[in-house]
Amino acid sequence: MKGISNIPILMFLPIVFFIFLVGAFYIGLQRDDDNSLPSVLIGELAPNISKNELYSGSEVTHELMKSPGIKLVNFWASWCPPCRAEHEKLLEIAESGTVIFGVNIKDDKENALSYLQRYGNPFQAVSYDPDGRTAIDWGVTAPPETFIINNEGEVLFRFAGPLVGQDYLSRFLPAYDSALSNE
């Protein structure tokens, strides 16, 4: 018993600290709703969007962002399965008359262009953000993310995830309908 009493308590601190870190990491992984994090952009003017155009004549300018009516800004990529899942809904929304600006992030330009040619282009203009800087400025965690913008260029709502399913119906659609009725 003499050997056990000589082990300093400080030797156990790294083990306790490690267990604490593992627990905190595990709890962080359990948060699966990116929409639970409020956007700091709500009520603020929309940040600038990359001046890189995905194709000629598709620059998203501040003037376009402040044009009349409700607009959506959708961050997407051709390699993103949830982006593919929401594409039909974006086409429907665009067909209804809402202007949608796209920001293609961390994608190959040719793949993005091919995707829009094959499946249809719901965007009035599309910015190309190969390094993800615009996405960072907007606080995008992963594509797809969609922002509702008013005619003053102010961010009204942020929706993380595809525009499909129950979350779309219960969270995005009411915010979108409210924005349309208040324009």
What would you call each of these model-derived segments?
Residues 1-52, 183:
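N-terminal targeting signals for export/organelle localization
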Residues 7-11, 118-122, 129-183:
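Thiol/disulfide oxidoreductase modules built on the thioredoxin-like
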Residues 31-32, 52-59, 126-129:
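Short gly/ser/thr-rich secondary-structure transition/capping motifs
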Residues 43, 48, 97, 123-124:
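A generic structural signal for alpha->beta connector loops
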Residues 49-72:
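A short beta-strand-turn-helix
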Residues 72-73, 100, 146:
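Hydrophobic beta-strand anchors of alpha/beta hydrolase catalytic cores
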Residues 74-79:
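Aromatic-flanked redox-active Cys/Sec active sites in thiol-based oxidoreductases
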Residues 84-120, 130-137:
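Structural microenvironment flanking redox-active thiols in thiol-disulfide oxidoreductases
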